[in-house]
Amino acid sequence: MAGTGLVAGEVVVDALPYFDQGYEAPGVREAAAALVEEETRRYRPTKNYLSYLTAPDYSAFETDIMRNEFERLAARQPIELLSMKRYELPAPPSGQKKNDITAWQECVNNSMAQLEHQAVRIENLELMSQHGCNAWKVYNENLVHMIEHAQKELQKLRKHIQDLNWQRKNMQLTAGSKLREMESNWVSLVSKNYEIERTIVQLENEIYQIKQQHGEANKENIRQDF
């Protein structure tokens, strides 16, 4: 229910769910559903009812790699397999190229690259064996601190929500008690007004009867005088 003296956009909510009763009474749910259905029938949104919103930019977070993958999926092309050539160690050339220095040099360079790659992997494994355990412990401790902080924030939010619910409940119960008292006063005033009006009507009838009696007595006196 909107108030008449309110700022535009403000609404006075006259529902007191913590105080009102009768929601579970037979027919209440059906009546509410009927009101909702009636509102949905009267509300006919147009095709451009979202025209006041800005046009969505679906490509805001797209990258070139994502765009290429979307195009590949749209064209129903199979995914390109990873090249494993860099991990292969081909044998030295044979046949006509067994005396080709360039071919031998490529084979040696590939072998050196593979050897260096394996050496780096070994170093990484050694570093992991020395420091990986402590690094993992530190990482887990950071996760524990983050979880504890998040749980504290969650407890604060829950307490804030509970306090708001209690405040709302107290406000509604107070308002409901005042409304009930005002309703009782209104009923009492209406009853008193009814009694006053009935008494006034009775007095008016009595006055009318007295006037009639006085009028008849005056007429009788006049007749006797003549």
Curated annotation (Swiss-Prot):
Superkingdom to which the source organism belongs: Eukaryota
Compartmental location: Nucleus; Nucleus, Nucleolus
GO cellular component: nucleolus; nucleus; precatalytic spliceosome; Prp19 complex; U2-type catalytic step 2 spliceosome
Modification Phosphoserine, positions: S94
Primary site of residence: nucleus
GO process terms (BP): mRNA splicing, via spliceosome
Family: Belongs to the SPF27 family.
Physiological role: Required for pre-mRNA splicing as component of the activated spliceosome. Component of the PRP19-CDC5L complex that forms an integral part of the spliceosome and is required for activating pre-mRNA splicing. May have a scaffolding role in the spliceosome assembly as it contacts all other components of the core complex. The PRP19-CDC5L complex may also play a role in the response to DNA damage (DDR).
Subunit structure: Component of the pre-catalytic and catalytic spliceosome complexes. Component of the postcatalytic spliceosome P complex. Component of the PRP19-CDC5L splicing complex composed of a core complex comprising a homotetramer of PRPF19, CDC5L, PLRG1 and BCAS2, and at least three less stably associated proteins CTNNBL1, CWC15 and HSPA8. Interacts directly in the complex with PRPF19, CDC5L and PLRG1.
The protein's name in its UniProt record: Pre-mRNA-splicing factor SPF27
Organism: Pongo abelii (Sumatran orangutan)
